[in-house]
Amino acid sequence: MDVIKVEGGHEITGEVTVEGAKNSALKLMAATIMAPGVTTLKNVPNIADVHVMGKVLKRLGATIDVLDKHTLVIDTSNVDKWETPYELVAQMRASTAVLGPLISRFGKAVVAMPGGCNIGARKIDMHILGLEELGVQFDVKHGNIHATTPNGITGNTVTLAFASVGATENLMMASVHAKGTTIIDNAAREPEIVDLANMLNEMGAKVRGAGSPVIEIEGVGELHPVTHTVVGDRIEAGTFLAIGGLCGKPVTVNGFDPIHLGLVLKKFEKMGLVVQREAHGCTVWREGPILPTDIQTLPFPGFPTDMQAQTMCLLALAKGSCVITENVFENRFMFASELQRMGADITIEGHHAIVHGVPGFSGTQVKSPDLRGGAALVMAGLVADGVTTVSAIHHIERGYEGFVSKLVSLGAKAERDTVPDDEDAIRD
């Protein structure tokens, strides 16, 4: 069993550079299906989810060459399949991102229901309802989504009930070749949406309004391959900046746009952290106690759900009490029970977490419940008394490249280790 061991109490300070955004890279990889030929993606994170998406594309007929650690050359000239295998899709929810591109290229698709972190229902109803407005017909059976377009794809106005990132992306990609114009109302506004729109436009698409609540896609003919650089990962950046605030000494994070963490950084300042913004990075440190601050997660430009666990870790050591409200995923407080094992005082009431600050954490064995919760447990171990051992780290490795090595570069005493499974039997 693979674990991350962290010894608390060491000074954490220094500088790190984040990788390309996981949530952007996966969708950009899927989008290459729509432009037959050779597309080069740069600044791609070397993480488990990217490896899975690569396998999905290969099963569909693509070839992928790895030029270097962060550059992929994807040739989709010979993609001739439109069905994704369950054993791959079950590993990663983002694999549904191929639904729109396959419909766009072939007019049909068979996609297994998604997997990934178990942090909510993550229903794809909005994907299906939205695509139906464009003329796509669906039959969901035996764990697979069967999509067909007997009359082609026709532009329409689609109003999303919730600003879903995945639904917005699938609608954007499916409508690129539609007859007429598609308007997505109440579209997701995340930076990763803008990154996808930028690459689609580079390929020859006509996408306008990305980053706003209304996106307009004018149908075009063929797309052409491009070379594109993935936007920096704002969530990885936020994680390391939160570490700077937790541990106290300055941590500088490069390789991202601080505007993409707008509300997070403002909340950090309300918590008493010092935030120094630069053009392509940011530095965070702390000169006094952590101040209690209420948080509620919302789609961008609101507070990201992907920063909720890391922020809870900070607030668990605040001088007072506060409330964290989770409005995006219903099961994203699973991490709280593990943090309680380390001494946190947290009460869960529905989609609210009441957090009472405690003086410190105690190192112990904890189990990563999901990607961000796992990272937050490692983060807590940096300031805990004694050694913290985090298991189920495959969740962490889905989204963070070289997490331990970056922590070590900042001064942490941490290591990735393998221990006998029976040592963790009581935690399973």
Region spans (language model):
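Structural preference for solvent-exposed beta-strand-turn elements
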Residues: M1-D428
